[in-house]
Amino acid sequence: MEKLNFLLKNTALLPTNLQKERLVQLVLLLNKWNKAYNLTSVRDPMEMLVKHILDSIVVSPYLQGNIFIDVGTGPGLPGLPLAIINPDKKFFLLDSLGKRISFIRNAVRELELTNVEPVLSRVEEFKPDHQFDGVLSRAFASLKDMTEWCQHLLTDQGFFYALKGQYNMEEVSALSAQFSVEKIIEMNVPELVGKRHLVLLKKIRINLMNYL
């Protein structure tokens, strides 16, 4: 907890004591499961706080809307940390590997989270009965693949939130003309070596009246 409090001082985030306890508990669960299921290459719990928890929750101030899907979530990143500090928002966490979804289900139960829905599926095959205000991805795919595979999940007003390391103009150039980059935000993740960026993208709405 001491380490987490120190890291949070270098952000604008103000989680409650219960939320901080749950973030620490999530790290302990991830560390425990990781020994058997190899969910992440990060082995040190202190490193997990920086590389997984802080790297996820710094996105929180930029989320617009109430219902989100985290595609290729792995062991629930960034979805689980974001759900912990945003109890008023709903998060669907999608992955195609059973062991990852098993971990997420266990974490949801242990942390008593009521705003998380684990989904075992490939993103292309997932056909929900509603769309989402935001599609999140962290180390999931290129911008081109993310937008094309996930476009059916997003409302017309929604955003794609792509967490990236070094910003790559080649990825932007490869985007289909039906998507636009709305904003690129350089993220400050305390004690994380290397640059982090949040890329916000939208679907371009075509006004059919222009063609009549």
Swiss-Prot record:
Entry-linked Pfam families: GidB
Keywords assigned: Cytoplasm, Methyltransferase, rRNA processing, S-adenosyl-L-methionine, Transferase
This enzyme's EC code(s): 2.1.1.170
Keyword hit for Methyltransferase: yes
Compartment list: Cytoplasm
Gene Ontology CC: one annotated term: cytosol
Role: Specifically methylates the N7 position of guanine in position 527 of 16S rRNA.
Protein name: Ribosomal RNA small subunit methyltransferase G
Gene source species: Histophilus somni (strain 129Pt) (Haemophilus somnus)
Source taxonomy: Bacteria, Pseudomonadati, Pseudomonadota, Gammaproteobacteria, Pasteurellales
